[in-house]
Each structure stands twice: as C-alpha cells, then as structure tokens.
Amino acid sequence: MGEIIDGKKLAKEIQEKVTREVAELVKEGKKPGLAVVLVGDNQASRTYVRNKQKRTEEAGMKSVLIELPENVTEEKLLSVVEELNEDKTIHGILVQLPLPEHISEEKVIDTISYDKDVDGFHPVNVGNLFIGKDSFVPCTPAGIIELIKSTGTQIEGKRAVVIGRSNIVGKPVAQLLLNENATVTIAHSRTKDLPQVAKEADILVVATGLAKFVKKDYIKPGAIVIDVGMDRDENNKLCGDVDFDDVVEEAGFITPVPGGVGPMTITMLLANTLKAAKRIWKMN
C-alpha cells in the first residue's frame, strides 16, 4: 500500500517558513509585494485569484489585485503590466491565464519584467532553467520537486518518466528532474507502449488532463507517483489523471487529488515572490 504524500501539510510548512522570513524583512521596513492581474469574469480564475490573494496576505506580503474587463485592449493590458514593472512596491507580477482570445498571452508574458516574473514563464527564466542557472521556476513544477524530496528519496540516479509535455508543467518538471541528475523520459499521447515506458519509472509524474488515465499496469512497484491532474470522473467527483484506487496498492508514495500537488502551487508562488523581492533589494 502506497504512502500518501500530504501536499497540504508540506505547503503549510513551506508557507510558515516564508511567513517567518517576511516578518523579519518587515521589521527592516521591507515588504514583498505581489500584483495579480485578472482579465474578464472567468469564475474558476476568480476563485483561484481570491485564494492567491488570501494566502499572500496571510504570509504578510502586500497583495494587489487589478481587475480588467473581458473586452480590454491588448495595448491597455500591456501598459498596466509596464506600470507594475516600474512600481517599486511590487516584486512579483502574475497575469492570470487564460486570457481572452484577442490578447496574445505570449506578448503579455514577454512584457512582464523577468525579475518580477514569479510564474516563471518569461523566455529568460525558461532559458535559465534549461541551462541550469538560478531562475524563477514555474510554481507547479517547483512544488512537484518539493513533494518528491519530502519522501526522503534521493532523486539523483533515479529513472523518471513525465507523461505530458506542456510548457507549464511537463517540460519544466522534466528539466528540473534532469537538473537533479535523474535520467528523464518525456512521454506523451504519441508515445508507443506508454504503460511499458511508464513502468520503468522510479518517479512518475502524470500531467495529461485525462481523468484516471494511469492505471496499475503503468506503475513499477514502489514508485513515487505524482498526479498533477484536476479532473472530474463519471460521477462528477474531483479526481486526478491517475486512477488512485487502482494505483495506490502498487505505488511506494502517491499524491492524492485533491490535497497533493494543488496546495503546493500557491505556496511556491509565495516563495518565488519572496525570492524576487530579495533579489531586487540586493540589486539596488
């Protein structure tokens, strides 16, 4: 029976560490600030942004929310981002995705100052990640690495398989595992004999967006299984990309959905914001 990796507990521990560090900085008259830009009225985005704000404030940081209508022009949005780039009280900028179709996500991400790009999506940060330089790492992949390390497992020398090749999770998590000296395979929908490939993994990260996609026959006995999915099953119940009940017997460690990867994402955003603030103050 696999041991459950408790993402809520780990996220709380990391958040407490960030909060303590922020409190020390506030004593010196320094307060990290995070600005979130929300375009339109997507309910899921709104809920997620509210969560980010609440957690930012709990950590003792300045939290700014800028709301823009669905029909805002690209030009207007870019000028808002440029103003935040110049704002000395803001150290992290996040534009909540997805954006309306008439706005280029690429342009918006490129406009965010890479020193304040706490989502880790700016090409400079992506490039730094790939050459192994210190950079802002996308929050979900950063959280995944912390979850794996929390099991006490040495990543170095392990076989890791990542199912999914998105720019937000799959590719960066594969690169992070490589930077930790794992031997990494990226698999995807076109991979032949996928269960066979997955079964070689000591560490399996699943980010397919397909409910209960990974079954027991994908799992090497004792493997660490990280489920990035957030789906609904046939009964409309929240589930992951891994069929938890089927896989839990084979796995050594496994993240649940909910309560695994999800809680880590906002925590790593706070850690990135703190890092951004410290970097900016150091440069100045």
Curated annotation (Swiss-Prot):
Pathway: One-carbon metabolism; tetrahydrofolate interconversion. PROSITE patterns: THF_DHG_CYH_1 (PS00766), THF_DHG_CYH_2 (PS00767). One of its GO terms (molecular function) is methylenetetrahydrofolate dehydrogenase (NADP+) activity. One of its GO terms (biological process) is methionine biosynthetic process. Keywords: Amino-acid biosynthesis, Histidine biosynthesis, Hydrolase, Methionine biosynthesis, Multifunctional enzyme, NADP, One-carbon metabolism, Oxidoreductase, Purine biosynthesis. The keyword Signal does not apply. It catalyses: (6R)-5,10-methylene-5,6,7,8-tetrahydrofolate + NADP(+) = (6R)-5,10-methenyltetrahydrofolate + NADPH; (6R)-5,10-methenyltetrahydrofolate + H2O = (6R)-10-formyltetrahydrofolate + H(+). GO terms for cellular component: cytosol. Its EC number is 1.5.1.5, 3.5.4.9. InterPro entries: Aminoacid_DH-like_N_sf, NAD(P)-bd_dom_sf, THF_DH/CycHdrlase, THF_DH/CycHdrlase_cat_dom, THF_DH/CycHdrlase_CS, THF_DH/CycHdrlase_NAD-bd_dom. It comes from the Bacteria. NADP(+) binds at G164, R165, S166, S189. It holds the Pfam family THF_DHG_CYH_C. Gene3D superfamilies: Leucine Dehydrogenase, chain A, domain 1 (3.40.50.10860), NAD(P)-binding Rossmann-like Domain (3.40.50.720). HAMAP family: THF_DHG_CYH. Catalyzes the oxidation of 5,10-methylenetetrahydrofolate to 5,10-methenyltetrahydrofolate and then the hydrolysis of 5,10-methenyltetrahydrofolate to 10-formyltetrahydrofolate. Belongs to the tetrahydrofolate dehydrogenase/cyclohydrolase family. PANTHER family: C-1-TETRAHYDROFOLATE SYNTHASE, CYTOPLASMIC, C-1-TETRAHYDROFOLATE SYNTHASE, CYTOPLASMIC-RELATED. Homodimer. This is Bifunctional protein FolD. It comes from Listeria monocytogenes serotype 4a (strain HCC23). The gene is folD.
